[in-house]
């Protein structure tokens, strides 16, 4: 079975990228993958992790906190404070 090139990662959803990343981690933890294959899938895993991080950061940037006025009614939004 041939793995897709890393070029396909850019169009993956977060869920698909995470699923592939989890499979790569499982395969590497099993320890029965040949060295060359381990290196190749590790590099793909790095690209998947970077893509997931980018998607999470983008989602985080879109999340806003609703501001409540003294009367208890919403008065607007502001960026969510990073933790």
Curated annotation (Swiss-Prot):
Please tell me whether the keyword Transferase is annotated for this protein.
no
Q: Which InterPro entries match?
A: Exonuc_VII_S (IPR003761), Exonuc_VII_ssu_sf (IPR037004)
Protein location = Cytoplasm
Domain of life assignment: Bacteria
Q: Which GO terms describe its cellular component?
A: cytosol; exodeoxyribonuclease VII complex
Nucleotide-binding found in the keyword field:
no
Q: Which GO terms describe its biological process?
A: DNA catabolic process
Similarity field: Belongs to the XseB family.
**What is the protein's quaternary organization?**
Heterooligomer composed of large and small subunits.
NCBIfam families referenced in this protein's UniProt entry, alphabetically: PRK00977.1-3 (NF002139), xseB (TIGR01280)
Q: What is this protein called?
A: Exodeoxyribonuclease 7 small subunit
Q: Which organism is it from?
A: Brucella melitensis biotype 1 (strain ATCC 23456 / CCUG 17765 / NCTC 10094 / 16M)
Source taxonomy: Bacteria, Pseudomonadati, Pseudomonadota, Alphaproteobacteria, Hyphomicrobiales
In the UniProt record, the gene name given for this protein reads: xseB
């Amino acid at each position: 079975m041939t793995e897709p090139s890393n070029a396909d990662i850019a169009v993956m959803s977060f869920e698909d990228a995470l699923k592939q990343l989890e499979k790569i981690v499982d395969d590497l933890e099993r320890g029965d993958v040949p060295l060359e294959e381990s290196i190749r899938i590790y590099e793909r895993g790095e690209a998947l992790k970077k893509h997931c991080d980018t998607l999470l950061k983008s989602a985080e940037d879109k999340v806003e906190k609703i501001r409540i006025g003294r009367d208890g009614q919403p008065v607007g939004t502001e960026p969510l404070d990073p933790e």
